[in-house]
Amino acid sequence: MKVFIVIMIIVVIFFALILLDIFMGRAGYRKKAYEPVFSKKKSDIELIHCGADLVERMMNDIRQAASSVHMMFFIMKNDEVSHNMYTLLKTKAQAGVSVYLLLDWAGCRAIKKTALQTMKNAGVHVHVMNRPRFPFFFFHMQKRNHRKITVIDGKIGYIGGFNIAEEYLGKKAKFGNWEDYHLRMIGEGVHDLQTLFASDLKRNTGIELGSDVWPKLQQGTISHKIYATDGYSLENIYLANIAQAKNRLTVCTPYYIPSKPLQEALINARKNGVSVRIIVPMKSDHPLVREAAFTYYSELLDAGCLIYRYYQGFYHVKALIIDDHLSIIGTANFDKRSLFLNEEVNVEIDDEAFTSEVYATIEEDMKKSELLTMEDFSKRTFRQRPAEWLGRALSYFL
């Protein structure tokens, strides 16, 4: 018995030290967090919600690149889809195009070192970000650059939720169809995507891009602004967005693990007469995230919020839609990791026609979703409850 008590004390102390490391690391990191909110711009913006279409469009644009290809992804892997992209990047680098590829340490661990080295040998500037380091080792282990940005010749930009791997094209039976939203942008906003890429490159490598990668760009037709977050400002931005809602709002997220203020903001919006819809996946791609989400649903259902669970594949969309004019689409999930740890980027689009297109896409998603009722919620087995509360307890790190 004494041995067991000693072991438990050691375990408690160990986890307490980990938490102390993470929270002290986060407090210290705040001074160098990069969270720009760019001024309003006008661009031509296209919504893409099919992974195969996205990769085809992106690769076609890269094939036409004349001067530069700047790509930043959270996840790329050791599969055919990823290797097709690696081959194209190598081809462009060998043709004299300046090619940079930024990858997150946690997200790119499936890539073989030989693949990275082969790209480097071909002239691709490959850099891995957010490697764990001291001090605050455990904090840095939790940091993720979750941004997905591609800028081609400084004129064409891509940003959104898709990564580059087979499952994002619906080629993994485990997930089936993969629903996500990505944006293709031409116009002034590409300048801001390039600035964000250049900043992440400099902060992680010390390398500065030349001024020639910011060509003069023409205005497009859709008003928008781009903002990046680094674990500190996203919660307040979302709270301000939700407070604007007068008639309806829709949250699309693969992981519904909000902060307490955001949960309360949605409930208050519903109490004030705003229609609140939340779309989440039926299945899960990570342990405990679905279980953690269930601990928030009772309050939402009691308030009259509608929760739809997408069942025709996996739902990875990151979007917040306010009334009939505001669409926020990007890389940030509606969870604590995106709110308080990750480096993210969103595009806030103020345009009725574009928002109408987004709503039409969401309506199609809802046809492939099941409405969660309080009766269904109450039928959860008691065996599920411990996993739910374990997920809730660990929600900051899921």
From Swiss-Prot:
InterPro entries named in the record: Cardiolipin_synthase, PLD-like_dom, PLipase_D/transphosphatidylase
Domain PLD phosphodiesterase residues, every copy: 141-168, 311-338
GO cellular component terms, semicolon-separated: plasma membrane
Transmembrane segments: 3-23
Keywords: Cell membrane, Membrane, Repeat, Transferase, Transmembrane, Transmembrane helix
Disruption phenotype: Cells lacking this gene show a lack of cardiolipin.
Topological category with respect to the lipid bilayer: Single-pass membrane protein
Keyword Transferase: yes
Family from the record: Belongs to the phospholipase D family. Cardiolipin synthase subfamily.
Protein name: Minor cardiolipin synthase ClsB
Organism the protein comes from: Bacillus subtilis (strain 168)
Taxonomy of the source species: Bacteria, Bacillati, Bacillota, Bacilli, Bacillales
Recorded name of the encoding gene: clsB
